[in-house]
Amino acid sequence: MADAGARRPFFRRRKTCPFTGANAPKIDYKDSKLLMRYISERGKIVPSRITAVSAKKQRELARAVKRARFLGLLPYVIR
């Protein structure tokens, strides 16, 4: 029998990408409300290891954020 003190280590389940699936939101540079969720409080794009966005969708997301910044929909820096 297993010892009460020797337990298996906690296994954290990998989060799935929020942009894949049936009713997932479409990444669009005009949707500033959605893009703001993936920008830090300093205005930087949050990495995919934190947001669990897939590599392909992270590239799409970064492109959309950069377009929105260029058009003035999102700020480059938040003070």
UniProtKB/Swiss-Prot annotation:
Presence of keyword Transmembrane helix: no
PROSITE patterns per record: RIBOSOMAL_S18
InterPro entries: Ribosomal_bS18, Ribosomal_bS18_CS, Ribosomal_bS18_sf
Gene Ontology CC annotations of this record: cytosolic small ribosomal subunit
Keyword annotations: Ribonucleoprotein, Ribosomal protein, RNA-binding, rRNA-binding
Pfam family name, one: Ribosomal_S18
Single biological process term from Gene Ontology: translation
Keyword presence, Transmembrane helix: no
Top-rank taxon: Bacteria
Molecular functions per Gene Ontology: small ribosomal subunit rRNA binding; structural constituent of ribosome
Subunit composition and interactions: Part of the 30S ribosomal subunit. Forms a tight heterodimer with protein bS6.
Family label: Belongs to the bacterial ribosomal protein bS18 family.
HAMAP family, A to Z: Ribosomal_bS18
Function: Binds as a heterodimer with protein bS6 to the central domain of the 16S rRNA, where it helps stabilize the platform of the 30S subunit.
Record protein name field: Small ribosomal subunit protein bS18
